[in-house]
Structure formats: C-alpha cells, structure tokens
Amino acid sequence: MPINSRTKGASYERDIVKILNEFFLKNNFNLTCKRNLDQYQTKNLSDINIPFHAIECKHYKEGNWLKPDWWKQVCTSAEAEGTIPVLIFKFNRVPTRVAI
C-alpha cells in the first residue's frame, strides 16, 4: 500500500517534536514545542517553532543530502517569522541530518 506523503511528513514532525521536548525536559530548559498546524492554511510557515528558530522537517524515501528547494523553503519561513532557519531531514535507512 502506498504511503501518503502528508501523513509520513506529519508523523516525522511529531517524532521531532517528541525528541526536542524530551531534550528540553532532560536539560532543564523551560521550553516546549509543538507542530505548527497553521502551516496547512497559511503559506510560508515553518513546521515547528521554538524561540528564535523556524524548523522545517523533511522525510523522504531516497536520497543522501538536502534539496536546495527545502533550504529555500525554510529560509522563506524564517525570514517571514524573523527567526533562524533549521532544516531537519531524513531518508529511509539514513540517519537524521540537520542544516542551520
């Protein structure tokens, strides 16, 4: 059965939110984050917001490095929000990578 890319992306965003929130809690940061559900209704919004950062998450089946369009997308979101762009991306059977 084919995988719905929107569902796969949302699941990956939830995984990243969980990892970030566990990190914040473990390291006594007074922060929490959640998925930005407004991203589906409003253009140029990031997937996840934490103070001063716009986070875009990408999970694809194949590849080994970020696509320039992904970086442009997160930079556009960050500029609109006045924050620092962060791209978190993963391909199947490849570790997660982060570009800042």
Residues covered by each model-derived region:
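Catalytic phosphate/metal-binding cores of nucleic-acid and nucleotide-processing enzymes, i.e., regions
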Residues: M1-I100
